[in-house]
Amino acid sequence: MPLDHVVFNQCMAESARSRQVDTMDRKNVQDLLKRFGQAPVPATYDSVLARLVKADPLLTGQKIRLVAYKAKFLNAHEADHGVIVVSAGAWGKATRLAEDEIAAMLAHELAHLERRDSKRMACESLAYVGNTDLTLPSAIRETTRESFSGESDLSLTLAALNQAREKAADARGAQILRLAGYDPHAMSRMLRKLAPPGVFSSTTHPAIDARIRHVLESINRVGNSP
């Protein structure tokens, strides 16, 4: 099932598709908060986020906020309507992230927001289905069904795209750290600290060692440039 690039590019350009992603992401966040309960965001996280956004020229004028939910595990993801969702496990005793590592985690999510990766993933699903009459949630359900049917290699293809996105977000996140005056190597330290099984490692996220190698290579390229 090849990706239809015409459908993909059209989807990315359409404001109606953006509204579909916005509605879908808002519902997902609401469902998450309803399931776990909302948690207060530590002031440190808000101040670090403000520093990162202020330093990033690609986010100028955008209002981005943090939302937290009550869960002991660690997870973070972005929503297309300018929200970064973080589990309270991010500041639990088992995690103990330094400020620059907090910045690294948030910078990774900001990189996803820059690229509109939430919409990009949805438009990829539509482009694989090839039926532009479908809504984006319907296209996602269709590709999910196809991925688990065992009738195609779509699951491997989508996983490869997702893994490439994560590596790109790591590299761009390190650049955002540098722009904000943080050590870009905090990205690799954050990844290493969060390396225990089940954290940022799955079919949608590359192995931690591969991500660390990639981000260090990107930092070195920038550091060695004239």
What are these regions, as identified by a protein language model?
Residues 1-226:
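A Zn2+-metalloprotease active-site environment signal
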